[in-house]
C-alpha cells in the first residue's frame, strides 16, 4: 500500500464516523466506537447493540469484536434498519517490544520489554482475505490455549467442562473472562474481578503464562490498512509496563510509544474509555494534538455489568 492510500484510509476515519475535537464537543453528537457483541465476549448481538444505542440517541456506533469481524455485516444491516451510522470495526490483541524506546519496561513487564496493546480497526472490509485468514489463525491459537487452561483447572480439582464456557448460543470466542464467569456461577468467587485477582484462579502464574497468540502490533496495523481501514490505539490507560497509571512517567512513555506506533501507521487514539478519568482524557487529547493523531471515543461495552462512558 502506498503512502497516499494509507493517508486516504486514515482520513476515512473522519468521513465515516470519527470526529475532530471540535466536532466531539458539538451539541447532539453522541458516538460509541467501541462495543463487543456475542461474536466475541459481549452479551448482546450486533443488532441488539445498534438498536440499544439508537434508542439512547447515539449518532454513530461501531461493533469492534475481539480478533474477528464476523459481526460487522449484522451491525451494518442493523444500522440501515434503525437509522444510525455504523462504522465497520474490529479490535485486535497484539504485543510490541518497547525495550529500545522504554528501557525500563524490561523491568516492569512480565515479558522483558513486551507490552500488550489492543488495536482498533475502523472502516475495514470484513471479507478481506488476509484479515479473515489471520483472525482464524488467532482463533485456532486461542482455542488451543483454552484447552490448556481447561486442563489446568481440571487438574486442580475444579469440575469444569468446555461447554460450561459457552455463555451465548453460537459463541465462537472463548477467553479468560468466560472462565471467570464459570467460577462466579459456581460460587468459587464473588465476582469476575476476584477471579482475575486470585492466585487460585486466573492470577496463578501458570495461568498467566498461557497467553493468547503474540501477534506483533506492527503487523496488525498493516493488516488493518490492507483491509481498507485505519488503526487506532485502544484504551491507552490500560497499558501495563510503562509506568504507574496516570503518572508523569506513564504519559511520557506513552508519548514515546505512540510516536513509534504512528511511524508504523497508527492513525488515531482512543481518548475516552471507562479506564480513563476526565483528567486522563484531557491529557490524551493533548497527546493526540502533539502527535497528530485523530481521536475516538468508546464505552468498551460488553453488557449491563459495564460502566458506560462515551
What are these language model-derived features?
Residues 25-175, 264, 270-308:
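A metal-dependent hydrolase metal-coordination microenvironment
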Residues 5-22, 26-40, 44-45, 56, ...:
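Domain-core and long-helix interface of multi-subunit machines
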Amino acid at each position: 500500500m502506498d503512502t497516499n492510500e494509507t493517508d486516504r484510509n486514515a482520513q476515512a476515519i473522519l468521513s465515516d464516523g470519527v470526529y475532530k475535537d471540535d466536532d466531539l464537543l458539538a451539541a447532539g453528537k453522541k458516538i460509541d466506537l467501541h462495543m463487543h457483541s456475542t461474536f466475541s465476549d459481549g452479551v448482546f448481538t450486533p443488532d441488539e447493540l445498534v438498536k440499544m444505542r439508537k434508542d439512547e440517541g447515539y449518532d454513530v456506533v461501531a461493533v469492534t469484536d475481539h480478533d474477528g469481524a464476523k459481526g460487522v455485516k449484522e451491525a451494518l444491516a442493523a444500522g440501515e434498519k434503525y437509522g444510525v451510522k455504523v462504522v465497520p470495526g474490529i479490535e485486535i490483541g497484539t504485543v510490541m517490544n518497547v525495550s529500545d524506546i522504554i528501557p525500563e519496561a524490561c523491568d516492569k513487564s512480565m515479558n522483558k520489554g513486551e507490552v500488550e496493546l489492543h488495536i482498533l480497526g475502523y472502516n475495514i472490509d470484513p471479507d478481506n482475505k488476509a484479515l479473515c485468514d489471520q483472525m482464524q489463525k488467532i482463533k485456532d491459537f486461542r482455542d488451543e490455549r483454552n484447552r490448556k487452561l481447561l486442563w489446568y483447572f481440571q487438574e486442580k480439582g475444579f469440575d469444569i467442562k468446555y461447554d460450561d464456557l459457552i455463555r451465548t448460543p453460537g459463541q465462537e470466542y472463548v477467553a479468560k473472562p468466560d472462565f471467570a464467569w464459570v467460577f462466579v456461577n459456581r460460587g468459587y468467587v464473588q465476582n469476575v474481578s476476584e477471579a482475575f485477582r486470585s492466585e487460585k484462579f486466573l492470577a496463578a502464574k501458570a495461568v498467566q503464562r498461557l497467553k493468547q497468540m503474540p501477534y506483533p502490533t506492527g503487523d496488525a496495523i498493516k493488516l488493518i490498512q490492507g483491509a481498507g481501514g485505519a488503526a487506532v490505539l485502544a484504551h491507552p490507560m490500560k497499558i501495563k509496563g510503562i509506568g504507574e497509571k496516570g503518572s508523569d512517567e506513564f504519559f511520557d512513555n506513552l508519548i514515546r510509544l505512540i510516536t513509534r506506533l504512528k511511524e508504523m501507521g497508527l492513525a488515531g487514539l482512543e481518548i475516552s474509555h471507562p479506564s480513563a478519568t476526565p483528567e486522563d482524557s484531557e491529557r490524551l487529547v493533548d497527546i493526540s494534538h502533539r502527535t497528530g493523531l485523530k481521536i475516538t471515543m468508546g464505552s468498551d461495552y460488553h453488557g449491563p455489568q459495564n460502566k458506560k462512558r462515551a
